[in-house]
Structure formats: structure tokens, C-alpha cells
Amino acid sequence: MSDKSDLKAELERKKQRLAQIREEKKRKEEERKKKEADMQQKKEPVPDDSDLDRKRRETEALLQSIGISPEPPLVPTPMSPSSKSVSTPSEAGSQDSGDLGPLTRRRLHKLGVSKITQVDFLPREVVSYSKETQTPLATHQSEEDEDDEEMVEPKGDQDSEQENEDKKQEVKEAPPRELTEEEKQQILHSEEFLIFFDRTIRVIERALAEDSDIFFDYSGRELEEKDGDVQAGANLSFNRQFYDEHWSKHRVVTCMDWSLQYPELMVASYNNNEDAPHEPDGVALVWNMKFKKTTPEYVFHCQSSVMSVCFARFHPNLVVGGTYSGQIVLWDNRSHRRTPVQRTPLSAAAHTHPVYCVNVVGTQNAHNLITVSTDGKMCSWSLDMLSTPQESMELVYNKSKPVAVTGMAFPTGDVNNFVVGSEEGTVYTACRHGSKAGIGEVFEGHQGPVTGINCHMAVGPIDFSHLFVTSSFDWTVKLWTTKHNKPLYSFEDNADYVYDVMWSPVHPALFACVDGMGRLDLWNLNNDTEVPTASVAIEGASALNRVRWAQGGKEVAVGDSEGRIWIYDVGELAVPHNDEWTRFARTLVEIRANRADSEEEGAVELSA
């Protein structure tokens, strides 16, 4: 109601102002006419009243007495002093009444217009503010003033034009009305504003957090004159870092894994923090790539350093960890506890040495947890019961030498055969079941402990599942095939320990490796086998311990010795073209041919 009263009062003040302007103009016009009459009287001699003038005045007085106003002359006739003095009282009265006639009628018209204006304004105010629509006040004033001017009897064309110009000038100069605090609060708490703000802030937040190149051309026109793969390698860019000041500080990243059910989730395991002896020795943190939050999604811990970790492939809520004490622990994110919901016993039936290898293999209806410890013991578990292993086997070479396993990998689609790397630098093939269960072939080539091993994962028109790569303390990465016990190729571009290696899950010729100098290398064997296709060194040059590709192959995660996890976007380098499989097959043929030539040259030198 206060807004309506203010608007009504404002309109009344505008009307009064217009009336004052009209009165002022009228007064000035009368003064001007009076001055002109005085000037003319001074210039011209006073003529004697003629008989015609006297009769005209009598006639005009008679007409005015009966209510008829005579037509005013176009040019005002100067009046002599004698005529003023001779005029009778009746004439003076009739003249006064004649002069006041138009003014009286104009005032009556103004009263009528004011009443009509009150009737017109109220509905417009209600309609305008019932919709809570903010409109400029000057617009209403302009419309109403125009209506007012149309209803008032016009004084003349010249006066109307002047008044319209004055009104337009006032409208232009009038500043927008400032909203009161009450009106602002009403808008801020209105349902429409809250819905709009809630929807818009989500869009703006996503736009501010988006780091990808929105101008990328998927048609590839920008790469037509360049080597597409090499150019895409430049897209290896830093995405984000996972680090928690409390749980990650002074800990080493020992293992990482991505969730199959939720591709944005990754779990990382950490060893003990020597500066915090009262904190749990083992920690596993679940990080979320989807949101730009800096804290882990879940925090799990146990009393022994976690050396290996993985998501239970067919159980999206379970996380499996292998500890330095030999225990296998199981965490459940549905539980409110951060400690394991299940764990294996510390007994001779299970592991009693550090477990560096945990892996869930099988199908949805038939799967097992496979674990291997550094004493060469392999156990098969059911995730429903970790009190005792379903199967156990000693990995022994020549029936006397236990294999100190440091890494394990299963070929794609195989749950029986696998390969393991050992502390002495030897790689073995092994089998879980059958007449040849246990250690099979021996692959010698590394001069130091094997730190990482991974089988070819990309599925395509040509089967490369027999290939695997290994990394070692001897500063090299080697390419192997299960069909031959000698390495196919040795990549020797690193100048420090190579701690881990992994094939791309989508590109047949691409793998990543990390070393002790904090360098991440991406090798595309279809481009070059001598130098990496793309490389990046992390800030601080901390040693990189682990590397893991995301399921889609677009991102690669690396963990360092300071507890930090670095996520890098690989870009178009990770996207395979249709001919990548055939090109890689030709590359392997060339590698085998070069290896055969080298062996022949070596044999010739030995014979000589």
C-alpha cells in the first residue's frame, strides 16, 4: 500500500508542477501584453473617442451582459485613459465576468480530469505489482501525463508543443528510482528469484571449473598439415592434484586403482608416516575426479602399511588392500567405520610376508581375489569369507627356489595364466590350475628388481594379449611376448629407476612409465621406439612410484613419494585411429627383424 501511496503522491506533485508552469506562462504573457500596450500608448497619441467606438463598446457590453463573449480582436486595441474612466460599473462587472469565464471553465475541466485519473491509476498499480515486475516509474508518468494533457482544454498549439517538450525533457532527466531495502529483500526472497539463482549458479560454477579447450576442432582441420599424433602429444597437460594435508603428508603412494562401476573414483594406498607414530600406518583414500573438491571421498586405514589396493571388480562398495604385515583387509564404504570390515588372519595358512599384488579376476557369478606375497605364496580368496583361503600355492622355480614376487598381471580375458616379476629381475609365467600349475617359463633380461609389470589391454581386430611390458631398477622398460623368453625391445631413455609401467586400455601401441626423477613418459610405438612421444616432469621432481590409466584412456594418474597424486589429460594422443592395430603389427614385425639381425651379429662376433 505504501508503494501505491507514493506513486499517487508523485503523480499529484507532477500535476501541480504542470499547473504552476501554465500559470507562470500565463502571467508572463499578460505582463508582456501589458508592456506592449504601455509602449504603444506612449508612442501613439490618444485619439478622441469617435461615435463608432462608443457604439462598439456599448454593443460589446450588451452582449457580455447576456452571456455572449465577443470575439477578441487579433491585435489588442489600445484603450485610452478616458475610455477607462468613462466605463460604467456594469461594463466593468461584465468585463470581469467575461475574463473569468474561460478560467472558471478550465478549472472545472481540471477537476474532472483529476477524478478520472484517480480511477485509471489504481488498476494499473495493482496489475503491475501483483506480477512483481519492476518497470521504470518515468514510463507511467509519461503515459499518464499525456492522458492528462489530452483531457485538458488546449490553450493553443504553441503552448501544447512547449509543454510536451518540457515533459520529455523532465522524463529524460529523471533518474531511475532506487529500490528500498524492503523491496530488495522481497526480490531476494521471492520464489522466482530463488529458482533462477539456484539454476544459474550451478551453470556458472561448472563454467568456472571447466578447464578444457572449448575451441577444439574435432574435424582435425588444424592437424592436416602436421603429424596428428605428435601434435596431440602436446596436449599432455596437468589436470589436477590429489593431496590431503592430514592423511597424505609424509607418506608414499604405494598403489592406485580406478573403479569400473564409477569411472570418476580412484583409490590410492599409502605407507606409514614416520613423523606421526600415533597415526595408523596404512591409509587408503578414495578420490573423486568428477568434482573439484580437495578432500577425499572416503578415508580408510589399518594398522599396517598398505602396499597394494584395488576396487573389488564386481562389488562397487568394496575396497581390497594388501598390507606389509601380510594381512588382506577389506573396507566397505557403506559402513561408517574407517577400519576394515574383514581381514585375513596372520597365520601360516595365509600370508606372512608383504603383499604387493592383489587382483580380482573372473566373472560376475564366479570370481576370486588373487593375492601374492614376496615369499612366493599365492592365495585365492572369496570376498565373502577372508578367514581362510580357498586355494593356496607356492610359486617355486625348479622346485627349490621361491620366487620373491614384486608384481603380477593377468592377460586380457584370462583368469588361469599370469606373469609375475621378481626381486632378482627375472620374469616368470605361471598357471593357477592344470597339470602345469605353478611357475612355467622364465624370462631373463633385466639387471635389477622388476618394479612393474603389465599385460596388453587394448582390444581390437588383432590380438596382442601375448605382449607385456616390465620396468626395473636397471633404468629400462622392456617389451616381451609370452611366445619368446627374450625381450623384443628395450627402451633405454630413462636416467633413473623406472618404478612402474602400464599399457593404455584403448590404444594398442601406447604405454606410460614413470621414473625416480619425477618424469612421466608416454610411448607410442607406432610413432617412435627411440624416444617418448610425450614427456612431462612433475613439479618438485619427486620420485614417481605408480602410474595408472583411467578406464577411458583419456587421463593418466601418477603417484609420487610425497603422497601426491597427479592427474594428466592425455588428449588426442590416447585416441586410436582405425589403422593403429595394423600399424602396430608392422611395428612388431620390424622389431622382431631388428632383434634377429642383432642376434646374428652377436653370434658372428662370438664365433670370431
Swiss-Prot record:
Looking up Gene3D superfamilies in the UniProt record yields: YVTN repeat-like/Quinoprotein amine dehydrogenase (2.130.10.10)
Which residues are annotated as modified residue Phosphothreonine in the UniProt record? T88, T139
- Name the GO cellular-component terms: cytoplasm; cytoplasmic dynein complex; kinetochore; microtubule; spindle pole; vesicle
Assigned keywords, A-Z: Acetylation, Centromere, Chromosome, Cytoplasm, Cytoskeleton, Dynein, Kinetochore, Microtubule, Motor protein, Phosphoprotein, Repeat, Transport, WD repeat
- Main location (coarse class): cytoplasm
Where is the sequence biased in composition, kind Basic and acidic residues? 1-13, 20-60, 165-184
Stretches of Pro residues bias are at 70-79
Q: Name residues in a coiled coil.
A: none
Location of the region described as Disordered in the Swiss-Prot/TrEMBL record: 1-106, 132-184
Q: Which GO terms describe its biological process?
A: transport along microtubule
Q: Where does this protein reside within or beyond the cell?
A: Cytoplasm; Chromosome, Centromere, Kinetochore; Cytoplasm, Cytoskeleton, Spindle pole
Bias class Low complexity marks the residues at: 80-90
Q: Which residues carry this modification: N-acetylserine?
A: S2
Residue ranges of WD repeats: 248-297, 301-341, 350-391, 400-440, 445-490, 493-533, 539-578
User: Where in this protein does the record put region Interaction with DYNLT1?
Assistant: 110-126
Assembly and oligomerization: Homodimer. The cytoplasmic dynein 1 complex consists of two catalytic heavy chains (HCs) and a number of non-catalytic subunits presented by intermediate chains (ICs), light intermediate chains (LICs) and light chains (LCs); the composition seems to vary in respect to the IC, LIC and LC composition. The heavy chain homodimer serves as a scaffold for the probable homodimeric assembly of the respective non-catalytic subunits. The ICs and LICs bind directly to the HC dimer and the LCs assemble on the IC dimer. Interacts with DYNC1H1. Interacts with DYNLT1 and DYNLT3. Interacts with DCTN1.
Q: What name does the UniProt record give this protein?
A: Cytoplasmic dynein 1 intermediate chain 1
Say which species the protein is native to: Bos taurus (Bovine)
The organism's taxonomic lineage, starting at the top: Eukaryota, Metazoa, Chordata, Craniata, Vertebrata
